[in-house]
């Protein structure tokens, strides 16, 4: 694991080439087809060196939850082990790692009719009124969820209306944790400044590779919009807004790089409190040797 632009893919490919391993992607952007440049999806050459599972498995119009990931990852892990190989999970979506390692609460699936009903109430009365509803049925979640966070607020109310139980009550029960021995590594530069520079460099390379054209093609489909999880991925939202004329090119670059740096900051916050984690420095010589030594 590690923040964006920290060198996870390069190390994973080295591991896959030199040892009997297969890579499973743990990345909420790489699951989407047609989102290659802005997600820093491994190139065709890199995928030939080390195939990645759970890449290009969803259309950008579709949703994909942590529960979906857990089910898919468990299936892939079992298959890789049955082949006599070692699965290597690589990515920066910490919620996916957490769901896989610790299990998930038995929450009901989304109900589009109830979601539409909640949205209609919000349009008529405002999200503050719905937040008061949540405070009555689930005061713990109401303290945690801000009235200006409609996605999480809607989900908490939806869960109650489907199940008759609060989100707090349901999240107190989890499925079984991962039934395998796991060695966990994080890779990142020692200095935040270095990571910030890497993020800026990588985004400029994405632009040179045709990222704006990629977003324009997605936009031209007509069925995608900025409220979809796929279009909330860093870089895509800012480029979409640029194409809509909301700001100029330089502002788009500034906003996209800033959003990516904020993502990296959140990822590092998760990792600093992550238990049983072995740290590696980005670009350091001997990372593979250190990793293999820890796995023995």
From Swiss-Prot:
Identify its protein family. Answer: Belongs to the IPP transferase family.
Biological source species:
Shewanella sp. (strain ANA-3)
What is the name of the gene encoding this protein? miaA
> Which top-level group of life is the source organism from?
Bacteria
Keywords of this entry: ATP-binding, Magnesium, Nucleotide-binding, Transferase, tRNA processing
What biological function has been recorded for the protein in this entry? Catalyzes the transfer of a dimethylallyl group onto the adenine at position 37 in tRNAs that read codons beginning with uridine, leading to the formation of N6-(dimethylallyl)adenosine (i(6)A).
- The entry's substrate-binding residues are 4-9
Region forming the signal peptide? none
**Descriptive protein name:** tRNA dimethylallyltransferase
- Provide the residue span(s) of the region labelled Interaction with substrate tRNA: 27-30, 151-155, 232-237
Q: Which residues form a coiled coil?
A: none
Q: Where does ATP bind?
A: 2-9
Q: Which reaction does it catalyse?
A: adenosine(37) in tRNA + dimethylallyl diphosphate = N(6)-dimethylallyladenosine(37) in tRNA + diphosphate
Q: Which InterPro entries match?
A: Dimethylallyltransferase, IPT, P-loop_NTPase
């Amino acid at each position: 694991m590690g923040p964006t632009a920290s060198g996870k893919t390069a190390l994973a490919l080295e591991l896959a080439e030199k040892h009997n391993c297969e890579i499973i992607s743990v990345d909420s952007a790489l699951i989407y087809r047609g989102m290659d440049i802005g997600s820093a999806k491994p190139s065709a050459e890199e995928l030939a060196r080390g195939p990645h599972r759970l890449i290009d498995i969803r259309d950008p119009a579709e949703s994909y939850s942590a529960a979906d990931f857990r089910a898919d990852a468990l299936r892939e892990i079992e298959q890789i082990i049955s082949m006599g190989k070692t699965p290597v999970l690589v990515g920066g979506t910490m919620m996916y790692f957490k769901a896989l390692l610790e299990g998930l609460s038995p929450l009901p699936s989304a109900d589009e009719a109830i979601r539409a009903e909640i949205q209609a109430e919000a349009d008529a009365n405002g999200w503050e009124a719905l937040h008061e509803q949540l405070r009555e049925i689930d005061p713990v979640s109401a303290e945690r969820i801000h009235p200006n966070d409609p996605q999480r607020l809607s989900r908490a109310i939806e869960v109650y209306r489907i199940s008759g139980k609060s989100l707090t009550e349901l999240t107190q029960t989890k499925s079984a944790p991962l039934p395998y021995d796991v060695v966990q590594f994080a890779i990142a530069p020692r200095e935040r400044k270095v990571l910030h520079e890497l993020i800026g460099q990588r985004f400029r390379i994405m632009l040179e590779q045709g990222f704006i054209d990629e977003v324009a093609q997605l936009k031209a489909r007509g069925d995608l919009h900025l409220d979809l999880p796929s279009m909330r991925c860093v870089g895509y939202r800012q480029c979409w807004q640029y194409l809509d004329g909301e700001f100029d090119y330089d502002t788009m670059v500034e906003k996209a790089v800033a959003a990516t740096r904020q993502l990296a900051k959140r990822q590092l916050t998760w990792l600093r409190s992550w238990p049983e984690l072995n740290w590696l420095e980005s670009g350091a010589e001997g990372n593979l040797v250190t990793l293999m030594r820890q796995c023995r």
